[in-house]
Amino acid sequence: MENQHQKFISRRNFIKTSALLGGTAFLGTGLPNIKKTYSKELDYVGNFEYPLAKPENILYSACLQCTVACSIKVKINNGVCMKIDGNPYSAMNLGENLPYDLSPKEAVSIDGKLCPKGQAGIQHAYDPYRLRKVIKRDGPRGSGKWKTIPYDQAIDEIVNGGNIFKDIGENQNVEGLKDIFVLKDPKVAKAMADDVTKIRKKEMTVDEFKAKHKDNLDVLIDPNHPDLGPKNNQFLFQVGRIHNGRIEFTKRFVNDSFGSVNWIEKTTLCGQTSNKAWVHSTREYLEGKWTGGIKSPRPDHRNTEFLLVFGSIVFEANYGPVQETEPITEGLESGRLKIAVVDPRLTKVASKAWKWVPIKPGNDAAFALGMIRWIIENERYDTKFLQNATRLAATNSDEPSYSNATYLVKVEKDGRAAKHLRANEIGIGTEKEFVVISNGKPAAVDPENSNLAIQGELFVDTNLEGIKVKSPLQLIKEEAYSKELAEWAELSGAKQKDIEDISKEFTSHGKKAAVEFYRGAIKHTNGWYNGQALIVLNHLIGNMNWQGGISNTGGGWSYIGDKEGQPYPMANLHPNKLSKFGVPITKEGWKYEESTLFEGYPAKRPWYPFSGNVAQETWPSISDGYPYKIKAALISSHSPMYSLPGGHVQLKTLLDTEKVPLLIASDIVIGDSSQYVDYIFPDLTYLERWATPGQSHHIRVKVNQVRQPVIAPLTENATVFGEEVPISLEALMMSISEKVGLSGFGKDAFGPGKDLNRMEDFYLKLVANIASGNKQGELVKAADSEEMELFKSSHRHLPKTVYDIEKWQQTLTSDEWKRVVYVLNRGGRFASSDDAYEGSFIKKKIPGLARLYLEEIADSRNSISGNYFTGYPKYLPIMDMAENLINDEGEFHLITNKEVFGTQSRTITNYWAQLALQPENFVVLNSVDAKKLKVDNGDKVLVTSTSNPKGEHLIAADESRPTIGKVKIVEGIRPGVVAISTHYGHWGYGARDIQIDGEVVKGEEVRGLGIHPNPLFRLDDNLRGTTLSDPIGGSASYYDTRVNIQRV
């Protein structure tokens, strides 16, 4: 640890530029004192004067070392963050959390739980390679040459454009953001948006649109295709890890002020297919439409008796280890819980399991359908639950929810299952009612009719009024019965007895069993159907909303002010807001057939009507100029070159100034992708900024942790709307707004007399909404004089650029301010862990149905193949977007994983965690395969694939490095499968030398150690430069690549 610490401090010896934190006096004089301060404070313990146990040295916030955003307790001395622990007020980080009304002075001695990443977040903030100043490329894109420029100059150049690179010999007139911001009139935007909706619904023709809007057609990208939207859409904001609060701030800028539809997150690189499959499988049917749905229900681990895990590393990643480990471990220790894990790799949780089944990657649906067959054959499904066709029927049978298992589905002449049959089609009701067979006769069903209690027959295959119909459970049965159990076992790579044993155990605990799954099951081209099959397993035992079953999160108090009586309804506090409209660059949320670009099949690129934030589609679409060109892009907290499968193929697009004439990044470092842009504006780390993240999927009570600045910002300051503030993403967006003249920022941004001049003017309103509660009588207490003094003293080290108490108070009313202080003193608002249940049920329920059939999916087509999707789970092999089989000849199947101490990029700075515990990753092989290859631990091997036959990782226009890693031999992986973890093998983030203002900044070799698997992943041969993807859920494929391995 001493050596690691000395390495960390010594960075100042070769970082000479003040553009980086390591070249400043702060690092040179501040960080060595951390070591001295630690030693000094240890001496204090015996004298009971330990400064980190004083309430005035504690601030509460929210982590961002992974997506979970744990509630954290930050301990500060002399303005320096010294220690990070879990917040004991929050049920996220202390199982039996402290009473919310307990004084922070009394809570100071109690710490909550936190993982290694969270505790190492100190080094994320104090990374010597952090950017402080704006830098502009001083050579071609990707040359590694930079120069610092004044903030105001950078804003002027990106807003006004022009020949802004003439000083380095480039003669290109670049359009500035003001030139792209063409549609400015809110009334015109609203009228056009409404009419584009009509075009989409085939209620208006393009000619009619053009005639109606003839005076404003010049604002459109293409008047012959008005559904592409205005030229404003040619500005793209692509973001990676971002949380609530900051999401709304950036959407306010991109969508509502600039009027672009292109706010694109990175979710398809994470769990989007899982999210969307659960949303559609838990929707309500209201006023003739399927609506709502819950993004990621999870097992109630505190009460589950049998947990079946597919492709989820519960103790190392997921949502997240801090929340899941304790109840699972308690269950194993007490004997309450039995676990089975279906995963090619022996994960930490698999090592504790009753059964570990090393499945073939991508064949989760085969295993699940084998289970479904066994469950149906042995009648181990919950008949009563599945038969309930209305909410009243469920209530009458003491069930908290019901299903659509009996809602009849029309079967077309070609055998395709289509939409649900409606009552009007056979003359027994309306078009908003479904049909079930009840007591041998068809009956009309309105699911939410409070006077209707109907139970339907589960297995139906008949004709009604000449219409062929089947029930959803019948369709699922037919798919499950399409193969013998032995065949399902062979496909999945499991033993038939394992399927039988697990099926029996799964159906032996009533409602207290659950299937949990994540990336390993769904990051495949067939990921949607894998996920849907696993969801159906939960539905078959009717475990939704029961203790020990599948449940909703506890949620929280609304931060956006959409509840009655809340003081700041943020959606309404934006005068002259623009109406965004048009097809996003990713074609997400649109059916190809409803666009004016429809020309039959295949489409030029995939469309994703059921997904969103399709990150891997962004840059290939930009490269192809389809559906339109992007003129300016701003990237934040996202690294497409590192995080995308096959991301290196996008390098040519990033380097091409014709493809994206203006490329900007907001980043804390010169990263693996931001190194290729034109300008980098420094951003704040999570210890210096605001957000209202929301809670983990695994907590059953309300949680609203608040991210707030706990250390002084380490970026330079800038003047925005007359206020001196730290340079950040928020400051950048506000400066652009000020320069361009966008609505929603500056004077009267929220309405007359309500300005948005500092980011706190926005974020404090969110906290005020949380303090107000969701209904009357839910106000938190107002801080008394003692708490007010504590608030002031605990913030004493923060400069006025982020903490100006007078200005903070001015943005709220006096009463709101006191309640906001009460919330901030505790790091958010938290319900008691005792508030999770109502009898045998989860208190905050999933409101919708358990849907076994998804008619909206069945009614849609693959935009490349033109074939319809299927509304129920089915087994599909791995295919490209055109539905060609992928049958590569590689000897090994490549998978990837995360370690508990690592995330994609930012943990490479964590000398106390990732770099101390495991400085590099490995090519992990089973001993059987190692013998075949004649390799041993530590041997170097070259890994190649069909899409990367030479094993080259392109990192610059004329530079690549080989995909070589060190071998690690284990027994806990399926023979024929090789695993390479992520978060290693960087070439930015301080890993390589760069030049700033003529000074060479030496890179640090340890940051580049290891092998990065993403350049090896299989690309779609029909879509140049795009990874294989799930056509429904939109997920990028991380587990469908075969590789060869050669000793070097």
From Swiss-Prot:
E.C. no: 1.97.1.14
Gene Ontology, cellular component aspect: extracellular region
Tell me the leader sequence span.
1-39
Enzyme class, broadest EC rank: oxidoreductase
Q: Note the SUPFAM superfamilies from the entry.
A: ADC-like (SSF50692), Formate dehydrogenase/DMSO reductase, domains 1-3 (SSF53706)
Location in or out of the cell: Secreted
Catalytic activity reads:
selenite + a quinone + H2O = selenate + a quinol
Q: Where are the membrane-spanning stretches?
A: none
| Any Pfam family matching the protein | Molydop_binding
Bound how, and how many: what does the cofactor note say? Binds 1 [4Fe-4S] cluster.
Q: Cite the post-translational modification comment.
A: Predicted to be exported by the Tat system. The position of the signal peptide cleavage has not been experimentally proven.
Which cofactors are reported in the record for this sequence? [4Fe-4S] cluster; Mo-bis(molybdopterin guanine dinucleotide)
Domain named 4Fe-4S Mo/W bis-MGD-type is located at 56-129
Q: Recall the GO molecular function terms of this protein's record.
A: 4 iron, 4 sulfur cluster binding; metal ion binding; molybdopterin cofactor binding; oxidoreductase activity
Give binding positions for Mo-bis(molybdopterin guanine dinucleotide): C270
The family this protein is said to belong to = Belongs to the prokaryotic molybdopterin-containing oxidoreductase family.
* Biological role stated in the UniProt entry: Component of the respiratory selenate reductase complex, which catalyzes the reduction of selenate to selenite. SrdA is probably the catalytic subunit that reduces selenate.
Report quaternary structure and partners: The complex is composed of three subunits: SrdA, SrdB and SrdC.
Q: What is this protein called?
A: Selenate reductase subunit A
